[in-house]
Regions:
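Pol beta-like nucleotidyltransferase catalytic core
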Residues: 1-42, 52-144, 148-267
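Catalytic toxin/effector domains delivered as secreted proteins or via bacterial secretion systems
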Residues: 45
């Protein structure tokens, strides 16, 4: 939290060092003042967007990542699902204290106008466009579409939220899903096929990315049947899991705790 600190036990790097000098960091380099095995790298982008050189992660004791061990070989490779910055921005205490979630609108999504073909952006956009043309209740937000500064605007009032990942791979889900749970929405989700390893099966509704007509049928039926109200207990449990387990700070703490149990920490 303080780049000028020189008395620390651990170093945590979120993707990369700052490119501009800050604190003791110069030329994207930090003189290490703790044991090398007490360093953690959190990767941010999936392998379809960013490939890390072997040299960079090899400097860290642990890598929290959704990259496969094949894409990012490292002796401290640790599956880090949900280790991303939230874009749903409220004071943490307010999020923890909130018990009631009044919903006055039906369906929203956040999808930018990006249509890159080397990632899933094009398919994501095409699916969203197809659904928006056929679902008048769908409010579409996103860069180049309808700008917002905070996801709360696009989630707090809505029962349902369309979530489509930009990269489809087992174990890779992002804040697109977790932010929806924090806002107590029921996600229509196109993404990680193993998301039920983390969250209750009833807490989200899978939709096919490559079959827009089928996705439309699933969404319409769910809203007509009142699935939001039926699934509230599962959504609440998914929200609890995000707040207590599947977030950057909880998983970083778990790495440090496991190290304390098995390794050595500087006094």
């Amino acid at each position: 939290t303080d780049a000028a600190m020189t008395d620390y036990d651990w170093v945590l790097v979120y993707d990369e060092f700052p490119r501009t000098p800050v604190g003791t960091i110069r030329n994207e380099t930090e003189p290490l003042l703790c044991p090398p095995d007490q360093t953690i790298l959190i990767t941010v982008e999936p392998p379809s967007i960013k490939i890390y050189s072997r040299a960079y992660p090899s400097q860290f004791g642990t890598v929290l990542t959704t990259h496969s061990i094949r894409d990012l070989p490292h002796p401290g490779h640790t599956l880090g699902r949900g280790c991303l910055e939230w874009l749903y921005i409220k004071p943490m205490q307010e999020i923890l204290d909130q018990k009631e979630f009044p919903k006055t609108k039906m369906l929203s999504t956040i999808c930018s106008a990006k249509q890159h073909t080397h990632t899933m952006h094009k398919k994501r956009y095409d699916l969203t466009r197809y659904l928006a043309d056929r679902l008048p209740e769908l409010d579409w937000f996103g860069h180049g579409i309808r700008e917002i500064e905070n996801k709360t605007v696009a989630m707090d009032d809505y029962k349902y939220h369309l979530c489509v990942e930009n990269h489809l791979e087992p174990h890779h889900w992002t804040e697109k899903l977790s932010d929806a749970f924090v806002a107590m929405t029921l996600p229509f989700y196109a993404g990680d096929p193993l998301a039920t390893e983390c969250f209750p099966q009833e807490s989200f509704i899978p939709i096919p990315l490559d079959n827009p007509q089928k996705a439309l049928e699933i969404i319409r039926k769910a809203m007509e049947d009142g699935e939001y109200e039926k699934r509230l207990p599962a959504i609440r449990e998914a929200r609890r899991l995000v707040l207590e387990k599947y977030n950057m700070f909880a998983q970083t703490a778990a790495v440090i705790h496991n190290h304390r149990e098995t390794g050595t920490i500087r006094p």
